């Protein structure tokens, strides 16, 4: 059976200091107008720089469960526990980024987390764009 529509979703960012979004409501409006077979879902968020209502007015559906999505968009790394098997994600993983950390312990913790994230991505057969 051939799917007649394509689904994208915007995740709720997990980091406390992150309020950005990969798409503005205006961009969602342009996409849904141009591609009527595109379904857009947005996980609800109180801290995102755009309101859920603005996304809804632009044609997105506000929904916590985005497991049905073809591509899941985010800004920062998705929490390991929130990764969905066999999905395609587009977010900045910084998995190979080298930076100066405040101390060695902080750097070691970041490296361990990034390795764990990559292992889980491979284990869950996730495509990371």
Which functions belong to the PLM regions below?
Residues 1-2, 64-66, 82-84:
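Solvent-exposed alpha-helices and their adjacent loops that cap or buttress functional pockets
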Residues 1-61:
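N-terminal glycine-/charge-rich "phosphate-binding" loop or analogous flexible N-terminal tail
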Residues 45, 67, 94:
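Residues that form or immediately flank small-molecule/cofactor binding pockets and catalytic motifs
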Residues 58-69, 78:
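Short acidic low-complexity segments
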Residues 71-129:
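Phosphate/diphosphate ligand-binding glycine-rich loop within oxidoreductases
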């Amino acid at each position: 059976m051939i799917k007649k529509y394509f689904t994208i979703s915007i995740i709720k960012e997990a980091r406390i200091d992150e309020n950005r979004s990969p798409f503005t409501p205006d961009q969602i409006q342009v996409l849904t107008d141009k591609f009527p077979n595109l379904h857009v879902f947005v996980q609800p968020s109180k801290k995102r720089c755009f309101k859920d209502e603005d996304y809804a007015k632009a044609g997105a559906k506000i929904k916590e469960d985005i497991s049905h999505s073809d591509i899941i968009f985010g800004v920062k790394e998705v929490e390991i526990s929130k990764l969905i098997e066999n999905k395609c994600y587009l977010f900045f993983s910084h998995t190979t980024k080298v930076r100066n950390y405040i101390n060695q312990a902080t750097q070691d913790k970041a490296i361990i987390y990034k390795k764990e994230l990559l292992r889980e991505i491979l284990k869950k057969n996730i495509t990371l764009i």
